[in-house]
Amino acid sequence: MIKIDDRSKKQGLKKGENIMRVKRLVSLALAGMLAASVALTGCGSKKEATTSDGKTIVKIGTQQMPNDEGIAKAMNYFQEEMGDSVSVEIVEFSSGKDVNTALAAGSIDFGLEGSCPASLAIAQDLGVELIWIHEVLGDVESLVATGTSGINTVVDLKGKKVAVPFASTAHFSLLKAMENAGLSASDVTVLDMQPDKIYASWNSGDIDAAYIWEPTLSQLSNKKTVITSGELAKAGYMTSNVEVVRTKFAEAHPDIVVAYVKALDKSVSMYKNDESTAIKTIAEAMELTEDNAKFQMSGSTWLTGSEQISSTYLGTSSAKGAVVQNLYDTAEFLKTQGSITKVPDKSVFEKAVNPKYIETALGK
């Protein structure tokens, strides 16, 4: 039986709210906190966690998302692939910030987060590797406007109030959309809000638009879609949800990391080959209707292991793919927002992207 530790519920959050709580005004403090976590973790060697009967405890940090990891959790694929010598614990978080903090402290081994928090983790030298892309974001994350806002295009945002969780993939996409439309930061009032606050502010009429993801996106009533992350991806600004693993853990247990990616590849295969079962699985796990689950799942691009190691994404061990440049560009964005003070050399990101576990899983 997989043990589940839902820390998002302990924080009083509603199920399914994937909250990116990285505040712009405290982003430098966050960077310092992460650095301190690394320093404290390095003060002593951490003994490997085991159960009373000697099984290796593997802690997978996750968020409530309608993706391949959601299927793998529900179908018990992680335990199946990792075997009887491993005890899998699922730890649920509500933001990439919280996932990074847990990774820095060594309290989880794997972590699901957006490409922005992943870039931040690499730039802050948290000792992680990017091993998988859960999904390339499309309609599942979008800029939407209220029906009474008068906003039909990105240009119409001028003089309006737009809410978005800062330092998130949505924030990155919003600012790129504004830049392409010729709008500066002073043209638009951009407000840092968590998804639950966006929902409340939308209903109270306090904001004109929001850039947000599912499931909050579907909960906003009387809305018009202005632009989607899928459209921005086609313009060269790809955002995604990715998986990172602690480098020290991966070096000690490469077989477990291979088993992890096998579980995800199995989930993607289910979605591509048996869509109805995949939709039903996500609907039950996230307490959604099947129609809603189908809508949310179709709003992003799921990649098989073979697709992951193409030049468009992770690439191969001998020739890293476009994700390296994407992470580097994201770090440049994070620097402009004050989330980091320095962008490391691109070689740092190239080293952190590690497709070898997928290659091994595929017998390459």
Regions found by a protein language model. Name each.
Residues 1-57, 359-364:
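Short, low-complexity disordered leader/linker segments with a strong preference
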Residues 116, 190-191, 197-286:
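Pocket-lining segment of extracytoplasmic ligand-binding domains
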Residues 50-54, 146-161, 247, 251-255:
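Flexible hinge/capping segments at coil-to-helix
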Residues 325-364:
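Conserved C-terminal helix/tail region of periplasmic/extracytoplasmic solute-binding proteins
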Residues 90-101, 114, 183, 188-204:
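Short helix-initiation/N-cap motifs at beta->coil->alpha
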Residues 63-66, 94-96, 106-119, 124, ...:
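Beta->alpha turn/N-cap motifs
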Residues 252-339:
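Secondary-structure end/capping motifs
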Residues 52-75, 94-96, 165-169:
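Extracytoplasmic "Venus flytrap"
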